[in-house]
């Protein structure tokens, strides 16, 4: 059965993650007030109470001084990019624009979640069975952690069960903002606690399973596995109030902790460094790319430190007459990868269709095109029947255990395409641990399979690309060869755990 309706929730009606539609304002000069982000410019005039904003400074000290001088309350600081999250009324927000050293004031826009034989279509299953990485082990993403920034995760889902009974989720965190003193912090949660319980609940659990679900056989005989079934998962829930500050706080946590995500003293074998983040959220209707946003500043710092960033391109469809792509995914920085949704027609074919809901870029402006396509339609992964997004799948299926009732479901969206790429990035870093995020991105794009559906391809920097599907369908085997470090296994060992092949 084909589910072509992507899981997309409206902010307010149901909790959804939506990145602010941000333009690219210029830095304030001289005595001119600092520019406002488009979202804040649109909403500030009607503000009657207080609002959270991101105050960007030429330095962190400038941003802190401006917030203090105007009497605003600090909620969080992003030390590495010189940004302070602060709460104030309309007059204070207007005043902070004119404080010395303030370069930009960004609104705390709401964010929205973007919602198989898929690993056959990507040749990912073939790669896990026939290739080995630089460590001599099957190419499963082993030795790499993937940070999933989303609604949270249920780490007890059977899809995450290791052979020893532990969970593939090695770190479980949540952004918490205190409604009384406005402070926002990223807090550690016990690994057996389900953080995916918001009104958007289920999205993060489903996404995490697509990244790194362990080989599992469902009671109906279906065999599933995630894109990188040997990777470890670090879940960062964006908190109970879904706004951009929560997602940025999660990215900032990764920036500060990617080398040892479980803390000092925990071995890399148990909890490997984070090498890629998955971000399956964005603004409804796309928006202009904003290089001054905190999101972009954070992902550029991550790239410089060897961490790739993967974005779902959005679920707004389009015809190429305008860009509906997710703004931060348009970042030209190497290692920032935007993903369109591909439909393999439930057969594993590599000559399927670009999903009709997958957001298109603007024809002729390659800066707005998605980078790559990956399966995002009819994807079966971990879920729970009581979680709202899981219930939209209408195809609950039982896991291997007697109590694993309805622990899997089938959902569609670019949210499901992006984690395929995040898992594949983990595989490629296992193949060549010394590769840079830019080299990994180039390997993925330059080796993509040119499926014919949709818009015609045109010449791009790394071959041919198109406004709807980017460079084509990801090819894991070819990308692994391009990034280097792999060898062909005589008999690659299947990932430990139960059987499963990401349907």
Residue spans for each PLM region:
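Autoinhibitory propeptides
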Residues: 4, 31-35, 61-136, 142, ...
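C-terminal subdomain of the subtilisin-like protease fold in secreted/lumenal serine endopeptidases
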Residues: 38-43, 267, 271-278, 374, ...
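Substrate-binding/access-modulating region of protease and related hydrolase catalytic domains
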Residues: 62, 214, 235-335, 346, ...
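Secretory targeting and sorting signals
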Residues: 1-28
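Solvent-exposed loop/turn segments at secondary-structure junctions
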Residues: 59-62, 81-83, 91-93, 109-113, ...
């Amino acid at each position: 059965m084909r589910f072509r309706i992507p899981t997309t929730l409206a902010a307010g009606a149901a909790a959804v993650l939506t990145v602010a539609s941000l333009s690219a304002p210029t830095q304030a000069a001289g005595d001119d007030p600092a520019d406002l982000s488009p979202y804040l410019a649109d909403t500030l005039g009607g503000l009657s109470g207080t609002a959270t904003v991101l105050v960007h400074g030429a330095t962190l000290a400038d941003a802190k001084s401006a917030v203090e001088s105007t009497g605003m309350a600090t909620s969080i600081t992003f030390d590495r990019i010189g940004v302070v999250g602060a709460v104030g009324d309309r007059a204070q927000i207007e005043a902070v624009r004119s404080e010395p050293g303030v370069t930009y004031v960004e609104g705390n826009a709401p964010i929205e979640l973007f919602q198989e034989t898929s690993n056959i279509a990507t040749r990912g299953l073939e790669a896990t069975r026939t290739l080995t990485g630089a460590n001599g082990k099957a190419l499963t993403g082993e030795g790499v952690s993937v940070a999933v920034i989303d609604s949270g995760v249920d780490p007890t889902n059977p899809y995450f069960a290791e052979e020893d009974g532990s969970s593939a989720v090695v770190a479980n965190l949540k952004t918490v903002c205190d409604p009384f003193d406005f402070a926002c912090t990223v807090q550690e949660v016990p690994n057996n606690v389900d953080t995916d319980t918001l009104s958007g609940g289920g999205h993060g659990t489903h996404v995490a399973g697509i990244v790194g679900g362990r080989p599992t056989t469902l009671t109906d005989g279906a065999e599933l596995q995630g894109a990188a079934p040997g990777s470890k998962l670090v879940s960062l829930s964006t908190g109970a109030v879904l706004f951009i500050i929560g997602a940025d706080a999660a990215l900032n946590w990764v920036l500060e902790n990617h080398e040892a995500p479980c803390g000092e003293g925990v071995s890399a074998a148990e909890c490997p460094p984070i090498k890629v983040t998955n971000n399956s959220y964005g603004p409804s209707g796309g928006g202009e790319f904003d290089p001054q946003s905190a999101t972009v500043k954070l992902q550029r710092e991550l790239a410089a430190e060897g961490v790739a960033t993967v974005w779902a391109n959005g679920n707004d469809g389009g015809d190429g007459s305008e860009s509906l792509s997710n703004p931060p995914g348009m970042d030209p920085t190497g290692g920032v990868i935007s993903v369109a949704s591909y439909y393999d027609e439930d057969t594993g074919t590599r000559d399927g269709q670009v999903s009709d809901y997958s957001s298109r870029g603007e024809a002729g402006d390659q800066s707005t095109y998605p980078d790559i396509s990956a399966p995002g339609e009819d994807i079966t992964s971990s879920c729970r029947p009581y979680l709202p997004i899981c219930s939209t799948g209408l195809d609950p299926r039982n896991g291997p255990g007697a109590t694993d009732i309805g622990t899997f479901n089938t959902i569609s969206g670019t949210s499901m395409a992006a984690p395929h790429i995040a898992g594949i990035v983990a595989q490629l870093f296992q193949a060549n641990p010394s590769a840079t995020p830019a080299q990994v991105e180039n390997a993925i794009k330059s080796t993509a399979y040119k499926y014919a559906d949709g818009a015609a391809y045109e010449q791009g920097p790394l071959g041919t690309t198109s406004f709807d599907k980017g460079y084509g369908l990801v090819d894991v085997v070819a990308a692994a060869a391009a990034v280097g470090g792999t060898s062909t296994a005589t008999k690659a060992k299947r990932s430990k755990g139960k059987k499963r092949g990401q349907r």
